[in-house]
Amino acid sequence: MVPIAGFFTDAAAGTLPGYCLVEPDYGAQSEENPQNIAVGEEFAAKVVNALIDGPAWDRTLLILTYDEHGGYYDHVPPPRAIPPDSIPPAVPAGESAYDGFGRYGFRVPFAVVSPWARRHHVSHRVYDHTSILKLVETKWNLPALTFRDANATAMLDMLDLRRPSFASPPELAQPLAVTDPSALSCSVTGPGTIPPPGSVTG
């Protein structure tokens, strides 16, 4: 584990390890309510730009995702999932385990940034966080850790490994400065519309 400055130094030198996990300072750089989304977006942009501008861009894959949905509404019910093992969740007496570990949570944003990412591609496959493990296991020929990652999809449909779509890094729009008043205000002036009862099925 190294401070984030070490990531930026290694990205600039092309000396990042084969796999690394980048986490923001959740107390300051989270995009989750009630924090300033612009600060989190600025951090993500710095990470993406460090990889694009680095000498190892041609062999880079960044998976940008989130640990959970942040409490925001999702009209799609979580689907069933393969439990990772046969061990039930430990819950206090009298509390329900609901579906145990046999159901996914709500959807989270997920993007692949790489010269090998398919241009304009939106995957319609079900992925979960163990899909990242599955991709790592596939790349380095490693055994699965649980039943869930053994049965996960490795996200290869998002990549074109025959030819890079972004051999020359794309020009990205710069995020609004966190001091820009328009970056600090919400564009919604009132509550959103709630779907009528029975209109959302799953």
Model regions and ranges:
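N-terminal pro-sequences and low-complexity stem/linker regions of secreted or lumenal proteins
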Residues: 1-202
